[in-house]
Regions:
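Intrinsically disordered, low-complexity polar segments enriched in Ser/Thr/Pro and acidic
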Residues: 1-2, 290
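Domain-terminus/edge residues, biased toward the C-terminal soluble/receptor-binding domains
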Residues: 139-140, 154-156, 160-291
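Active-site-adjacent loops and short helices of periplasmic peptidoglycan-processing enzymes
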Residues: 2-160, 164-173, 178
C-alpha cells in the first residue's frame, strides 16, 4: 500500500504514530532496508537537491578522489539566479573530492554540473546514467533530467526511492564522512586566488551551535545526508541517524516552511527518528514479519 504505518513487535506497547507535517515521508532501517513507517512514500514528488545523492553515488563509482575536473562555461553559467553555488569559475580546476564536498555540504549546483560533464560529457548523458542507476538499486518511480535537482516537471522521485538512494550512498565511507561535516573550506586556486571559500552545511540536524534560528534543530544522533529546497519541491531532506545498534534513514518531502523557515523538515525527521529508536531495536527489525 502507498501509506502503511509500521507498528512495534511488542503487542503490549502502544506505539504512537509519529506526527509529521510532510505529506510524503518514510523511515527505513539503514542496514536491512525494512520500512518502519511510511506516508505516501510511493507518490511522485519533486526531490530538489536531494537529487545530489545520486550524483554523488555515480561520482564515487566512476572517479578517483584526486582526479581533476575542469569547470565549463555551461557549468558556471547555467545555474539560475538564487540557486546555491560554490562560485566556481569557468576553467577552474578542482579535484573530485573538493567537488563532492561542495556538492553535499553547501549544496552547490555548479559543482553538480562540473561532475556530470566530467563523468558523462554532458548533463543529458549523465541524467541517463542517473536513471539507469536508480533502476539498478530498485527505484520504481524516479526520473532525473539533471544532476542537481533544479526544478523540471520531468524530474521527480519518491520518499521510498530516495531512501533507497540514501541507503546505497551511506555504504561509501567518503559519502558518510562528507555529509557529517558542518563546514568546508575550498582552497584558493589559480582561477580563484582571493582566499578560501568557506561553506556551511544546509542540514540543521547536525548544526550543534546554530544560533540564527529561534529553535535548536540539532539532533544528537543525526549523522548527516542531504537537504533540498525549491519553490515547487518545498523543503526536503534525506537524513540519517544512529543510536546504539540501530541506524535509520528518514526522508521528508514537500514539507511546510511555516516553522522558522526551512527547518520543519528537521522537526519531522526528529519525530520519525524518535519513533524508530523508541520502538525498534536491531533484533525487532530483523525479526519483523513482512506484511
Amino acid at each position: 500500500a502507498d501509506s502503511s504505518d509500521a507498528s512495534s513487535n511488542n503487542s503490549s506497547t502502544d506505539v504512537s504514530v509519529p506526527s509529521t507535517y510532510s505529506p510524503a515521508c518514510i523511515l527505513m532501517d539503514q542496514n536491512s532496508g525494512k520500512i518502519l513507517y511510511s506516508k505516501n512514500a510511493n507518490t511522485k514528488m519533486y526531490p530538489a537537491s536531494t537529487t545530489k545523492i545520486m550524483t554523488a553515488i555515480l561520482t564515487l563509482e566512476n572517479c578517483k578522489l584526486d582526479e581533476v575536473a575542469t569547470a565549463s562555461h555551461n557549468a558556471v553559467y547555467s545555474i539560475p539566479y538564487s540557486y546555491s553555488v560554490a562560485t566556481i569559475q569557468e576553467g577552474e580546476e578542482l579535484t573530485i573530492e573538493q567537488l563532492l564536498n561542495v556538492l553535499l555540504i553547501p549544496s552547490a549546483n555548479d559543482a553538480a554540473v562540473v561532475l556530470a560533464e566530467h563523468i558523462a560529457g554532458s548533463v543529458e548523458a549523465f541524467a541517463e546514467m542517473m536513471n539507469n542507476k536508480a533502476v539498478e538499486i530498485g527505484c520504481k518511480n524516479t526520473h532525473f533530467v539533471n544532476p542537481n535537482g533544479i526544478h523540471n516537471e520531468d524530474h521527480y522521485s519518491t520518499a521510498y526511492d530516495l531512501a533507497l538512494m540514501g541507503q546505497y550512498a551511506m555504504k561509501f565511507d567518503v559519502f558518510r564522512s562528507i555529509v557529517s561535516k558542518t563546514s568546508y573550506a575550498l582552497p584558493a586556486t589559480a582561477k580563484y586566488d582571493k582566499e578560501d571559500r568557506l561553506f556551511n552545511t544546509t542540514n540543521d540536524l547536525i548544526k550543534k551551535n546554530y544560533s540564527s534560528s529561534p529553535r535548536n534543530y540539532y539532533y544528537e544522533y543525526a549523522t548527516g545526508a542531504k537537504t533540498g529546497y525549491t519553490d515547487a519541491a518545498k523543503s526536503c531532506i534525506v537524513a540519517t541517524a544512529t543510536k546504539n545498534d540501530v541506524s535509520l534513514i528518514a526522508v521528508v518531502l514537500h514539507d511546510s516552511t511555516t516553522d522558522a523557515g526551512l527547518s520543519q523538515r528537521a522537526l519531522d525527521c526528529k519525530a520519525l527518528f524518535e519513533y524508530g529508536f523508541n520502538n525498534y531495536s536491531e533484533k525487532t527489525i530483523v525479526n519483523k514479519t513482512d506484511v
